[in-house]
C-alpha cells in the first residue's frame, strides 16, 4: 500500500519572493518532484494564500479583520485552482477540494467521501479554503486534513527556512538548529512553527511532521527520504 503524505505549500512559497503572485519556476520544480512521487505515494496538498492576501493584512487596507480572513480563505481557492491548472498541463491527475463553496473554481466541497473518492481515483488531492472558517490558520487546516486522509507524514515546506531553531536564526546568531523535537517541547518553548491548535491536533492524532526548506534542490524528495537538513516533530 502506498504511503499517504500531506504537503503544505505556503502562498509565499508559490510567489518565491517575486513581485508576481506565482513563480512558474518554483511550481515547475515542485511538479517535477511530484511526478517522481506519484507512483509510490498518495499525495495531499494544503495550499496557503499569502501571495494574494493574508487575514492579518486587513489593517493595511483599512478593512475589517473578518473580511481580511474571508479574503485570505478565497485566496487559497484561487491558488488551488491555479495549481490544478498547472497539474492539468502536465497531465497529473488531481482533484481540487474546497472548504468553502466556489463552484466555478472548485467543483467539490471537502468531505470524508470526496477525500476518499479522490484517493481511490489515484488523484493528487489539493485542499483549498483552509478550514472554511475565519481566524483559523492554514496550519490548523493541515492538521485537520492530515487527520481526515490518515496521512502517514506531514511535510511542511518553509520558504527559505530549513527547519526549526531555538530562535529566529536571522535575528539571533546563537540560535541552535533542532533536528528533532516533540510536540510537548515545541509547545512548552513556544516555537512558533505552527499554531498551538495545529500542534495539539497533530499530537492527539500521533502525526509526524517534517519541517524543511521548500526552496532547496529536490527538497520534497530529500525530506521524504530523510536526506538533507530538516526537523522531525513527533509525539
From Swiss-Prot:
> Some GO term, biological process aspect, for this entry: which one?
UDP biosynthetic process
Q: What catalytic activity is recorded? A: UMP + ATP = UDP + ADP
Activity control, as annotated, is: Inhibited by UTP.
Instruction: Quote the cellular component terms of the Gene Ontology held in the record.
Output: cytoplasm
Would you indicate the residue range of the signal peptide?
none
> Where, per UniProt, does this protein localize?
Cytoplasm
This protein's pathway reads: Pyrimidine metabolism; CTP biosynthesis via de novo pathway; UDP from UMP (UMPK route): step 1/1
Residues annotated for UMP binding in this entry: 49, 131-138
EC number(s): the record gives 2.7.4.22
Q: Name one GO molecular function term.
A: UMP kinase activity
First-tier enzyme category under EC: transferase
Task: Write out the entry's keywords from A to Z.
Answer: ATP-binding, Cytoplasm, Kinase, Nucleotide-binding, Pyrimidine biosynthesis, Transferase
What does the UniProt function comment say about this protein? Catalyzes the reversible phosphorylation of UMP to UDP.
Alphabetized PANTHER family for the sequence = URIDYLATE KINASE (PTHR42833), URIDYLATE KINASE PUMPKIN, CHLOROPLASTIC (PTHR42833:SF4)
Q: What is this protein called?
A: Uridylate kinase
Task: Report the source organism.
Answer: Mycoplasma pneumoniae (strain ATCC 29342 / M129 / Subtype 1) (Mycoplasmoides pneumoniae)
Query: What's the gene?
Result: pyrH
Amino acid at each position: 500500500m502506498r504511503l499517504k503524505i500531506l504537503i503544505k505549500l505556503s502562498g509565499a512559497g508559490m510567489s518565491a519572493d517575486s513581485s508576481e503572485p506565482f513563480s512558474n519556476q518554483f511550481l515547475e520544480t515542485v511538479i517535477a518532484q511530484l511526478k517522481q512521487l506519484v507512483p509510490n505515494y498518495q499525495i495531499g496538498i494544503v495550499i496557503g494564500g499569502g501571495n494574494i492576501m493574508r487575514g492579518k493584512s486587513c489593517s493595511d487596507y483599512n478593512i475589517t479583520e473578518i473580511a481580511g480572513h474571508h479574503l485570505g480563505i478565497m485566496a487559497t481557492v484561487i491558488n488551488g485552482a491555479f495549481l490544478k491548472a498547472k497539474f492539468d498541463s502536465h497531465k497529473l491527475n488531481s482533484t481540487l477540494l474546497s472548504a468553502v463553496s466556489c463552484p466555478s473554481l472548485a467543483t467539490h466541497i471537502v468531505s470524508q467521501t470526496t477525500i476518499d473518492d479522490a484517493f481511490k481515483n489515484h488523484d493528487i488531492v489539493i485542499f483549498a479554503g483552509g478550514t472554511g472558517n475565519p481566524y483559523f490558520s492554514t496550519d490548523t487546516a493541515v492538521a485537520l486534513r492530515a487527520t481526515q486522509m490518515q496521512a502517514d507524514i506531514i511535510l511542511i515546506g518553509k520558504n527559505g527556512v530549513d527547519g526549526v531553531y531555538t530562535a529566529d536564526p536571522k535575528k539571533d546568531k546563537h540560535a541552535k538548529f533542532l533536528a528533532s523535537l516533540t510536540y510537548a517541547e515545541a509547545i512548552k518553548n513556544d516555537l512558533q512553527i505552527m499554531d498551538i491548535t495545529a500542534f495539539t491536533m497533530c499530537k492527539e492524532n500521533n502525526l509526524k511532521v517534517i519541517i524543511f526548506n521548500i526552496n532547496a534542490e529536490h527538497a520534497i524528495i530529500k525530506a521524504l527520504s530523510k536526506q538533507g537538513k530538516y526537523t522531525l516533530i513527533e509525539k
